[in-house]
Amino acid sequence: MEGNWFEGPPCSVRNCKSTWYFKNAGQTFCRRGHAQHGIEIAQDDEPGAGTFYQTRKRKVVRNHLDTGDEDEIVYGTAGRSLYLQAFQIILQLQCQALTTKLGFDQRIEGMIRDLWALYLSLSYESFTSSFLSLNQNSTQSESSDSDFDLIDPESQPGADPSSRKTKETSQSHSISYPRLLYSSAFIYVACLLLRLPLTIHKLEVLIRKNIIPYYRAYKQIPLKIFKRLQKNYVRMLIPFHYPTYQRIQSAVLTLVDVLVSKYELKVPPPNEPLILFELINSFFFPLEIFIPASRLLNLVHSQISLQGTSSDNYQSKIRSAQSIHEKLSDAEVMLLATILVAANVCYGFDDAQTRNSKYKDSMFTVKTNWNMWLSQVQKINEKEKDKFYEIDEQSILTLNNSEMDKYFQWYEKEFVEENNPNNIPEGILNVFPILSKDSHLQENQPTDILTDESVIAEDVKLEQVFKPVGIKESDKMDFSRRKDAYISMLPFSPNTENTAHRVTIMVAKLYNIKLDSLIAAIRYVESCLKTGIHNQD
């Protein structure tokens, strides 16, 4: 080091206010080690003078490998652009997973790109309008980088129209900042526009199984981009838990409301026939109820259309946006309710009910063992469900050897970095191997893995649930004279021991939806069915 410390103007590096410098090998450095480029700070020869002067030097090309530039956090407009670039990288990864792993149509990538372009144009418009409003009010301080702008639209409670007018600026700000949750909304809306049978529940399952990158998607962002993001933006890209059905639905409805109100985008309803067929298979119902469920669904839609056309303002934009909101929010729940009501019509949840009207002229009727259906469906879904996400220190003590091996495999896949094997020391891996290679121990371990043979065995048991049995001639005559009256599944004071109530609870639990919403949908479908029967009479 040449000479002593001397004082000068503040350092030219951003966020460094050091005024003390030293020289080393002819180069001037500040107290924090930042090299001063382009300006030479000279000290007076007379000691104690306390004066300094600046001399211009030939402009030197700045070294791009300087750590100060690479690690510098970007704020303002550049920070927004960098965050949107990081979000776009995650969208590209999810599109690749849809086309390569799941075999989706290649058009979905272009559809998501178009929706993202519309969203970007809308965010730019909202930012410019808010920027102009800030410039008009000179007394208002700039708050573009505050937490106020990072408000999630779905976390806001329902407000009155008057309060919405006062918070118009904050809503326009929130449009410019899509959280990671809205990536699933882009996928779902793109599938709606392409008429692909993707449900919110299936999207949630694909995210939980890491088939669609979500929980660790931020690790795929280049480091030179990620470390320059503001901390508030980083929080929006790192999720703390997997998204639930309700949160994905809220993000979808928010995105649809924005696109419909701004661009008058026509969002079609879900592809109900294909989704209905998939739901019947997933809950192991007989395929014979597909046609009754489809007819019942058409009856429900006709009742909704009759109720909608009675209003004079039905063709207005507000009414159309509300109708799209209602269709998307209740579509899957309405399909589940239609399947359950169709099963009640065809087979009945109570032994006193009419079994199946198509067996009136036959010597057979269908005897349904709903207790077996409940036990087998619950068993199959428990085997297919990954239970490690909610595991804690108490439940880990109940795992056997095979479950413990699967837990370590899951942990290694989810949390151990492939490019950094030093996360787990090599010595510990030798003492406690993740994959046990002891064949004699594995032979004695119970196999809880769901194989194809076990699935076939469970399906064979499910075939015994809906079994045609013979009836006597006298019972046949009484059965044919019986009046076709529909018995409601769930009365207003439901009994928890009732078979219909137990089946409804099971379906709501497996589909991860609220029980109250499913019960309300079932009662609405039943009212439409009774209205249709009354109109035919």
Curated annotation (Swiss-Prot):
Chain residue ranges for the region called C-terminal cyclin fold: 233-349
GO BP terms in the entry: nucleolar large rRNA transcription by RNA polymerase I; transcription initiation at RNA polymerase I promoter
Main location: nucleus
Sequence positions that bind Zn(2+): C11, C16, C30, H34
Record carries keyword Protease: no
Region: N-terminal cyclin fold, residue numbers: 81-232
Zinc finger (RRN7-type): 4-37
Compartments in which it is found: Nucleus, Nucleolus
Keywords: DNA-binding, Metal-binding, Nucleus, Transcription, Transcription regulation, Zinc, Zinc-finger
Residue span of region Disordered: 142-171
GO MF term set: RNA polymerase I core promoter sequence-specific DNA binding; zinc ion binding
Region annotated B-reader, chain positions: 38-64
Chain segments carrying region B-linker: 65-80
Function of the protein: Component of RNA polymerase I core factor complex (CF) that acts as a sua7/TFIIB-like factor and plays a key role in multiple steps during transcription initiation such as pre-initiation complex (PIC) assembly and postpolymerase recruitment events in polymerase I (Pol I) transcription. Binds HomolD box in rDNA promoters and plays a role in Pol I recruitment.
Domain remark from Swiss-Prot or TrEMBL: Although it shares weak sequence similarity with sua7/TFIIB, displays a similar subdomain organization as sua7/TFIIB, with a N-terminal zinc finger, a connecting region (composed of B-reader and B-linker regions), followed by 2 cyclin folds.
UniProt similarity note: Belongs to the RRN7/TAF1B family.
Record-given protein name: RNA polymerase I-specific transcription initiation factor rrn7
Taxonomic source organism: Schizosaccharomyces pombe (strain 972 / ATCC 24843) (Fission yeast)
The encoding gene: rrn7
